Swiss-Prot record:
Protein name: Bile salt hydrolase/transferase
Gene Ontology CC annotation, any one: peptidoglycan-based cell wall
Active site: 2
Gene name of the encoded protein: bsh
Statement: the UniProt record of this protein carries the keyword ATP-binding: no
GO molecular function: chenodeoxycholoyltaurine hydrolase activity; choloylglycine hydrolase activity; transferase activity
Organism of provenance: Bifidobacterium longum
C-alpha cells in the first residue's frame, strides 16, 4: 500500500512525496538518469530529442532503471501506487498508439515532459502495456503525477484509461479515485477549529481540548481511511515559505498515514510497514528520503551530480 501527496509554495514550486508501504524491500536506492543517458523504450515510444534529467527512488533490473517515484528538473513528478483488483492492462502493443511499458512509465513521463498539462494531452494516444519483469509479479498500479500547479491520477482499467484531475492532491490505493473523492463527502463536517461550548438541556458542555472538531476522521491504515486522513492534513496544513519548512510539511503530512510494524497483516501473514518516505522539491531540485529503520531525512540534490553524463548514477544510501 502507498500514499502520495503534492502541494506548492507561494512561488509555485512543487513539493511531491510518497510513502511506500510493503513487507519487504526491493533494494531500492536513489537513481539519477542524466540527460545524456541513452534509453531505448521497450516499444519505441517517442520523446524529447534532448530528454530531461531525472532523479528518484528505484531499482535497476535488466540494465534498466525502474523508478517507484521520480521527478525532473522542471518540477514534474510521478509515483506509482498499488492498485490491485482494478488495474487492467493489455500485454501486447496496440497499433496506432504510443505504447509504453508499465515499468518504464514513470521514467518516460519525467524524461519527456515538463508539465502535467503536457502529460495529460499526450495520454490521449498512449497505451500502457504490462511487461512482466522476469522473476517478478505483474505490477498492478495507478499513477499520481504532479507539478507546481496541479496533479492528476492515471488509472488503466478494463474499460480504458481514466485520467482524473486531483483537486485534493493526494492518492492512496484501491478502490478507484472516484470512490475516494465521493467518500470525502462523509467527512464534510470535520473541522480543525476549536469546538464552541454548547448546552444540552441544563448541561453545559465544553471541549476537552484541541482536536474535538476532528472527531470522525478514521484512524486505521486501510486505503480509504488513509486517503481521508492525508487529504485532511494536506488541506489544512498552514502555508510555508522556505525549503526546510516545506520539506518538514511534506514528511509530517506523510507521517500522518505511515504504517508501523505489527499494525496490519497482509494476505501472506507478513506485516506491512512504511519502508521509506521520499519527497522532491523543485525549488532546489532536491530529492529527500528516509527509511523505516533510519528516520533521518537525507537529501540528494541534482546539482551534486553530472546531469549531462551518459552514465546511470546509483547513489548508495
Amino acid at each position: 500500500m502507498c500514499t502520495g501527496v503534492r502541494f506548492s509554495d507561494d512561488e509555485g514550486n512543487t513539493y511531491f512525496g510518497r510513502n511506500l508501504d510493503w513487507s519487504f524491500s526491493y533494494g531500492e536506492t536513489i537513481l539519477v538518469t542524466p540527460r545524456g543517458y541513452h534509453y531505448d523504450t521497450v516499444f519505441g515510444a517517442g520523446g524529447k530529442a534532448k530528454p530531461n534529467a531525472v532523479i528518484g527512488v528505484g531499482v535497476v533490473m535488466a540494465d534498466r532503471p525502474m523508478y517507484f517515484d521520480c521527478a525532473n528538473e522542471h518540477g514534474l513528478a510521478i509515483a506509482g501506487l498499488n492498485f490491485p483488483g482494478y488495474a487492467s492492462f493489455v500485454h501486447e502493443p496496440v497499433e496506432g498508439t504510443e505504447n509504453v511499458a508499465t515499468f518504464e512509465f514513470p521514467l518516460w513521463v519525467a524524461r519527456n515532459f515538463d508539465s502535467v498539462d503536457e502529460v495529460e494531452e499526450t495520454l490521449r494516444n498512449v497505451t500502457l502495456v504490462s511487461q512482466i519483469v522476469p522473476g517478478q509479479q505483474e505490477s498492478l498500479l495507478h499513477w499520481f503525477i504532479g507539478d507546481g500547479k496541479r496533479s492528476i491520477v492515471v488509472e488503466q482499467m478494463a474499460d480504458g484509461m481514466h485520467v482524473h484531475h486531483d483537486d485534493v492532491d493526494v492518492l492512496t490505493n484501491q478502490p478507484t479515485f472516484d470512490f475516494h473523492m465521493e467518500n470525502l463527502r462523509n467527512y464534510m463536517c470535520v473541522s480543525n477549529e476549536m469546538a464552541e461550548p454548547t448546552s444540552w438541556g441544563k448541561a453545559s458542555l465544553t471541549a476537552w481540548g484541541a482536536g474535538v472538531g476532528m472527531h470522525g476522521i478514521p484512524g486505521d491504515v486501510s486505503s480509504p481511511s488513509r486517503f481521508v486522513r492525508v487529504a485532511y492534513t494536506n488541506a489544512h496544513y498552514p502555508q510555508q515559505n522556505d525549503e526546510a519548512a516545506n520539506v518538514s510539511r511534506l514528511f509530517h503530512t506523510l507521517g500522518s498515514v505511515q504504517m508501523v510494524d505489527g499494525m496490519a497483516k497482509m494476505g501472506d501473514g507478513q506485516f506491512e510497514r512504511t519502508l521509506f518516505t521520499s519527497g522532491y522539491s523543485s525549488k532546489t531540485n532536491t530529492y529527500y528520503m528516509n527509511t523505516y529503520d533510519d528516520p533521518a531525512i537525507r537529501s540528494y540534490a541534482m546539482a551534486d551530480y553530472d546531469m549531462d553524463s551518459s552514465e546511470l548514477i546509483s547513489v548508495a544510501r
